[in-house]
Amino acid sequence: MHEIVNDVFYNLAKQYDPNSEEHLVGEVDYHLLCDDQPYEGLPSHRDALRFVFDELVKKSIEDQETARISWGDTFADQLSPLVYDLDQAQASPLDLQVFFYCPNIVKTDYYGNVWYDAEWKPNDDNCGTTVPYWYALMEPVHGRNNKPEDFKKVNEVLFPNGTDQLDIYEWTTDWSDYFDAGHEWYGACCWSVYDRSMKRYVVMLVSATD
């Protein structure tokens, strides 16, 4: 398993968040991977997640050492390297139409608040849980709100051969402190997608709070 270094999708993502080192659109952090090994369904998805989180652990350690150099031991020691236990992660297959569903905007008020014709709405009952893909992309905590056209454009570039040959899994998010921020309020999500037509994986992570 290895990261895809160059892809047209990265250029698109940079238009949405030019200052980020990650490939972010809204609150969705995208990781594109490919593998020399044959695709074996769910075990391959788990391998893709393991690769992504190994890289995130390395980055968290690097960030801690950078903080040590810049701000000293006291500050750096308050930072903890990322921890995860993928053996605790549970996966459920997702229907394509459910995953890629995108509502229409029915109203936008003076302050920029948006109303959709979707059945799902953020409330106290679903606070800190998994949010729909469309919501994570279109309703970030800070910064610009994206529109249904953006949702469509992002996925057309990400999956240029269409969605018919995609295998999608939704994962629980109680197996890594990466998701702690999202559990506080906005939401935490982990999805893995395998595109049979392109023989590549897309791991999508969401974890945000105010």
What are these model-derived regions, one by one?
Residues R144, P148-D210:
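Acidic, proline/glycine-rich low-complexity IDRs
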Residues M1-G162:
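Extended, low-hydrophobicity segments enriched in charged/polar residues
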